Amino acid sequence: MLRLLSSLLLVALASGCGQPSHNPSSRVVNGEEAVPHSWPWQVSLQYEKDGSFHHTCGGSLITPDWVLTAGHCISTSRTYQVVLGEHERGVEEGQEQVIPINAGDLFVHPKWNSMCVSCGNDIALVKLSRSAQLGDAVQLACLPPAGEILPNGAPCYISGWGRLSTNGPLPDKLQQALLPVVDYEHCSRWNWWGLSVKTTMVCAGGDIQSGCNGDSGGPLNCPADNGTWQVHGVTSFVSSLGCNTLRKPTVFTRVSAFIDWIEETIANN
């Protein structure tokens, strides 16, 4: 196991994780179109219906063979594929990689409860049926060290193809929005999220910018001290009152709380 984990780390380091070839500009409500391939670990998780595949969630490529997404994005009754290197949905731009997912290669956290999203553990891993080919449009995400907590106001970006407004349309092109981190002390206040937020989550936004339906499972991208980007969050839920409700920031599964589970799942499969 230790050998495997070391090799995974070496793969990430050798590929230059978290360093997009196309720098991001300084679904996503009131966001903006992302620079093409500026979040090259962003994936589109798609499910099959009536003979065609449809975007349902985002995700992050964390090794050439594994994607990190949300537990609520996964249903064992569905057939999935992952699209890497995507920018504009429905348009073949030449850099996409479409990779099928085998039914037995969906790994949802064992403590995830689909009837209680606020209970936490909304995280899953998807094993690709073949390895991703890394390049300008497809690169690996860096993950944060286990246990790392971002400070209040840390500047992070959500990215995805989620709805542009509550009950609004899905965008064709990848969107991004700046969502400053809201620390647990603030996010758990009674007039914010209260008891719905756990310490294994991270909040970000809470004003006019937020995630929305279709962004689920995608990354919260945060700058690290070494100049790389790290995926600190997996998009989990927003308020039932609307995607951009005041004092209801987007809630993410905190990746640094699940590093051990991620490493063990990859090592054992």
Swiss-Prot record:
Keywords per UniProt: Disulfide bond, Hydrolase, Protease, Serine protease, Signal, Zymogen
GO terms (BP aspect): proteolysis
InterPro entries reported for this sequence: Peptidase_S1_Elastase_sf, Peptidase_S1_PA, Peptidase_S1_PA_chymotrypsin, Peptidase_S1A, Trypsin_dom, TRYPSIN_HIS, TRYPSIN_SER
Catalytic activity: Preferential cleavage: Ala-|-Xaa. Does not hydrolyze elastin
GO cellular component, one term: collagen-containing extracellular matrix
The protein's Enzyme Commission number: 3.4.21.70
Propeptide feature ranges: 17-27
Keyword Signal: yes
Membrane-spanning parts: none
Residues making up the signal peptide according to the UniProt record: 1-16
Catalytic residues of the enzyme: 72 (charge relay system), 122 (charge relay system), 216 (charge relay system)
Peptidase S1 domain sequence ranges: 28-267
Disulfide bonds: 57-73, 156-222, 187-203, 212-243
Sequence similarity: Belongs to the peptidase S1 family. Elastase subfamily.
Task performed by this protein: Efficient protease with alanine specificity but only little elastolytic activity.
Listed name of the protein: Chymotrypsin-like elastase family member 3B
Chain's gene name: Cela3b
